[in-house]
Amino acid sequence: MGCRDVHAATVLSFLCGIASVAGLFAGTLLPNWRKLRLITFNRNEKNLTIYTGLWVKCARYDGSSDCLMYDRTWYLSVDQLDLRVLQFALPLSIVIAMGALLLCLIGMCNTAFNSSVPNIKLAKCLVNSAGCHLVAGLLFFLAGTVSLSPSIWAIFYNSHLNRKFEPVFTFDYAVFVTIASSGGLFMTALLLFVWYCACKSLSSPFWQPLYSHAPGMHTYSQPYSSRSRLSAIEIDIPVVSHST
């Protein structure tokens, strides 16, 4: 498998990266990070559940799909440390992952549409597809770490809240969506690393174009006769001898 070809591994990693970024978007916007369930013993009243997200908060009665209270300014007054950290970490992870997707796309497009012989005028602008995929893999790994760590911490912080107050806090499915998306980012990075390691025997340097040697004036010179480069000593001059 050569680095000059677009393989299923790079295409699959790109699609996996898109799905993971979409999952991070969903996890960031979902108002289902933590539930606070308030149980009443009055038969004339219903139990109340408060759904807490990173940006909004919603309170519902049991059996109702409408929010009794919908706080759109919750993100300004978040009083839970793990959610405050997630407000910063998840958008940062999305930005890093989108940059990795852009690098991955540049590498694939350069591999698919670039000619085998580069233009001498564009020699300084040539891109190493393998280098793009390697850096993209590192960025995907970084994005997964940035999003996974605070998401797991939110689970343990939930236990801290139950010990500090009452056992009424539970984490909701947005935590699982984010953890699964972070796992997808790690899988994307792994696919790109495997692809790079499979073709690392290529002799091109890390960030040089994917050719056996860097293109230059001596490599792509205008065609002319090879004998014109020979010196007078190297040119074979026929000698005519007269027999006596």
UniProtKB/Swiss-Prot annotation:
One of its GO terms (cellular component) is lateral plasma membrane. It is found in: Cell junction, Tight junction; Cell membrane. This is Claudin-12. Keywords: Cell junction, Cell membrane, Membrane, Phosphoprotein, Tight junction, Transmembrane, Transmembrane helix. Residues 1-10, 109-135, 196-244 are cytoplasmic. Belongs to the claudin family. Disulfide bonds: none annotated. Interacts with OCLN. The modification Phosphoserine is found at residues 228, 231. InterPro entries: Claudin12 (IPR013287), Claudin_CS (IPR017974). It is a multi-pass membrane protein. Plays a major role in tight junction-specific obliteration of the intercellular space, through calcium-independent cell-adhesion activity. One of its GO terms (molecular function) is identical protein binding. GO terms for biological process: calcium-independent cell-cell adhesion via plasma membrane cell-adhesion molecules. Residues 32-87, 157-174 are extracellular. The chain crosses the membrane at residues 11-31, 88-108, 136-156, 175-195.
